[in-house]
Amino acid sequence: MHRCIGERAFDETDVSTEEARALYRDMVRTRRFDERSLALQRRGWMSGYPPFKGQEASQVGAAHAMAEDDWLFPTYRSNALQLARGVPPSDIFLFRRGHAEYHSDHDVPVFPQAVPIATQIPHAAGAGMARNYSGNDEAMLVCFGDGATSEGDFHEGMNFAGVFGAPVVFFCENNGWAISLPRERQTASESIAAKADAYGMEGVQVDGNDPLAVYEMVRDCLRSAREGDPVLVESLTYRQGAHTTADDPSRYRDEDPDIPEWRKRDPLERYEEYLKEQGVVDDAFVESVREEADDELAAAVTEAESVDDPDPEDVFDFVFADLPPQLDDQKAELQDFLTRHDPHELDLS
């Protein structure tokens, strides 16, 4: 497994001081974003939310390894990847508040978040083949969890990329849980990375709580992908929080003996301690980064609140040219409900 923290001094890594500080800055931003999002969701300010605490190093490290024109295919828990890739936090807030038009950002090479499990994997393989036909140089980074490897779309995307040499890095964040199912009940394979052999591609493992290691590994894998050699990366990390705000993880992992050990390896605390020991950052830098992150998020919340709420009837648009009878009936029922109730006065918490 590829690892930097605990095994190499900073000057022995292949990461510049500027990049190391940028990684830390985005890890603080994304941790603060996650904390703020949970608090806002609990107030009923936005819809259900999938927390990613514990996975900041994995996602931020991968995002920073991408070239400017590389395409990101995120899953529903990839908010840190999106933020580090350049998606404004206000856009993610607005998406969670029901604005479908903020599902993706036209100024950043990021596909919309895929909520159905694994559907983005064949999309990335297809986009990679389109890149081969066009002769461009960008690569695709598609992100998914360990649970997605049990889906048929995982097989289809991996097989397609392996056969045709699509420029794709398949980035699996193995956070230990597919909702409530532990990895050992997800697959009989020795590891997720070992699955790559069946598709004729390289499979590698990286310490997903080490942003320097993730950065180095994903950067090198993207270089290979651009040469026609797709790679499967298994980033070993841990989901510290619930699957979503609708989940109660105490029902299935209270007795998990690995929890204390993973919390000792909290990626943000671990990285901050390492950078201080190596003389890369000091207390003043850390405090300034925290203040910047809090100011940015406060402004993002204000910006999101300044946008008018979406029309509830929009949920029926852009799927069918002509609504089928059952949806037509549902739309009429919604319209009748809205004429009798002010949505702003309803308690939807």
Each model region followed by its residue ranges:
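A generic structural signal for short coil/turn motifs at secondary-structure boundaries
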Residues: 12-13, 49, 81-82, 114, ...
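Cofactor-binding active-site loop characterized by glycine-rich and histidine/acidic residues
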Residues: 32-35, 44-166, 185-188, 193-200
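A general secondary-structure junction signal
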Residues: 76, 235-237, 319
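Glycine-rich ThDP/TPP pyrophosphate-binding loop and its adjacent helix/strand module
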Residues: 119-296, 306
